[in-house]
């Protein structure tokens, strides 16, 4: 579960390393985001010569959360770190590669480009 002020890793090669959630999109009183949700983030740490720089405000899709993700068949999946992928205003990833596994739940939220770039879908 991601809320305002949550720090996340960046799971793409956009140049950002750490981001902080500054808003959960989807309603004025929406408090938490989970896998597949879109959030607004501020870049807190970035590498030199990346596509983004520190202080930029962008949208991101949450791809991994430490909170248990319960599936319809009763199984549970959980990741070690919270992570997100930066997207532009057209909901396309800023980076060209995705690092680490992503869950199948992204398919239901229509993030097919992220699924196709990911090395492993759990």
Swiss-Prot record:
Source organism per UniProt: Rhodopseudomonas palustris (strain BisB18)
SMART domains, per database record: Ribosomal_L14
Biological function: Binds to 23S rRNA. Forms part of two intersubunit bridges in the 70S ribosome.
Listed transmembrane segments: none
Cysteines joined through disulfide linkages: none
Keywords recorded for this protein, A-Z: Ribonucleoprotein, Ribosomal protein, RNA-binding, rRNA-binding
InterPro entries in the record: Ribosomal_uL14, Ribosomal_uL14_bac-type, Ribosomal_uL14_CS, Ribosomal_uL14_sf
Protein name: Large ribosomal subunit protein uL14
A GO cellular component annotation in the UniProt record: cytosolic large ribosomal subunit
């Amino acid at each position: 579960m991601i809320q305002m002020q949550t720090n996340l890793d960046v799971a793409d090669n956009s140049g950002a390393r750490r981001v902080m959630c500054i808003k959960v999109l989807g309603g004025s009183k929406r408090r938490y985001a989970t896998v597949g949700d879109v959030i607004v983030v501020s870049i807190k740490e970035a590498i030199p010569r990346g596509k983004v720089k520190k202080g930029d405000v962008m949208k991101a899709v949450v791809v991994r959360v430490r909170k248990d993700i319960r599936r319809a068949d009763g199984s549970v999946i959980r990741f070690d770190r919270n992570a997100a992928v930066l997207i532009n205003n057209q909901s396309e990833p800023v980076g060209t590669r995705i690092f680490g596994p992503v869950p199948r739940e992204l398919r239901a939220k229509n993030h097919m480009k992220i699924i196709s770039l990911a090395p492993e879908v759990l």
